[in-house]
């Protein structure tokens, strides 16, 4: 029964999208720390992680540790045959494949997070590896690896968040000046004295104000 359930889970994306999805491929080019291009031409975005940008950010500048993250991804996969596992959503709005990527027994998404080259970034509805990826991030954070060793770009004595709402909604924390923070009702306001406190309470960084953004040494 367990084997049948797993097979149905793996085949579900094929049924929903009605197309042939690659379950392995040779990596022709590493785009950045969380995206690759196969020799067959498909772009693949790693599910559940977010590496620093190398080409641009909201400030039109590369982000700290972007080059290092790209190079780490390159060392892991470039020119090699990788295999894919899919979740409920198999393509994003840019028509990139969304996948959990493996090389041999190495879970590439998790390895990049575990060594501090990328952050855990939950993405609904693709949730099957969330617990594992969060464990990888906690390990990197505890050991101050990679991104976690760099100083914050905008350090703050306080971070704001809203009390948990509907089940399944990702809880976010914000810098004080973030527009989303200003809209939080006083009755629902949660104040954290550190990023670690917010993360330990299950909150994730806002993608608009990006309280985890770092400086290069």
Put a short name on every predicted segment.
Residues 2-10, 14-217:
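Small beta-barrel nucleic-acid-binding modules, primarily SNase/OB-fold domains
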